[in-house]
């Protein structure tokens, strides 16, 4: 289920790239460029931290959803997709975190 939801959201975000910025929040962010998108991602990340400190699970889920959404917009700005991140996570699955980190420092 999660993958299909991410795919549907990704498809909508990609379609919004060519939408009128006055009619679409996503198109507006993409039109304003990377700095505006990064500002939103940072803002949403801060809200995730605050929600975590609040110890309210539903609020945390809400804010993480916002962060994921805005991160997907950032990926789209760079012509990447959520699927690219899922592929990277799949690549790392079953790999020790310490081994993965060591492999990064070697390359």
UniProtKB/Swiss-Prot annotation:
This is Phosphoribosyl-ATP pyrophosphatase. GO terms for cellular component: cytoplasm. Its EC number is 3.6.1.31. It is found in: Cytoplasm. It catalyses: 1-(5-phospho-beta-D-ribosyl)-ATP + H2O = 1-(5-phospho-beta-D-ribosyl)-5'-AMP + diphosphate + H(+). InterPro entries: HisE, PRib-ATP_PPHydrolase-like. Keywords: Amino-acid biosynthesis, ATP-binding, Cytoplasm, Histidine biosynthesis, Hydrolase, Nucleotide-binding. It comes from Neisseria meningitidis serogroup C / serotype 2a (strain ATCC 700532 / DSM 15464 / FAM18). Its main location: cytoplasm. Belongs to the PRA-PH family. The keyword Nucleotide-binding applies.
């Amino acid at each position: 289920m999660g993958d299909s939801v991410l795919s549907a959201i990704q498809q909508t975000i990609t379609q919004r790239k060519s939408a009128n910025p006055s009619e679409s929040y996503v198109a507006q962010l993409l039109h304003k460029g990377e700095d505006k998108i990064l500002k939103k991602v940072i803002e949403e990340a801060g809200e995730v931290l605050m929600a975590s400190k609040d110890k309210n699970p539903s609020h945390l889920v809400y804010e993480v959803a916002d962060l994921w959404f805005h991160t997907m917009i950032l990926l789209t700005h760079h012509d990447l997709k959520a699927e690219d991140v899922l592929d990277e996570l799949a690549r790392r699955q079953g790999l020790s975190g310490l081994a993965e980190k060591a492999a990064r420092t070697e390359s």
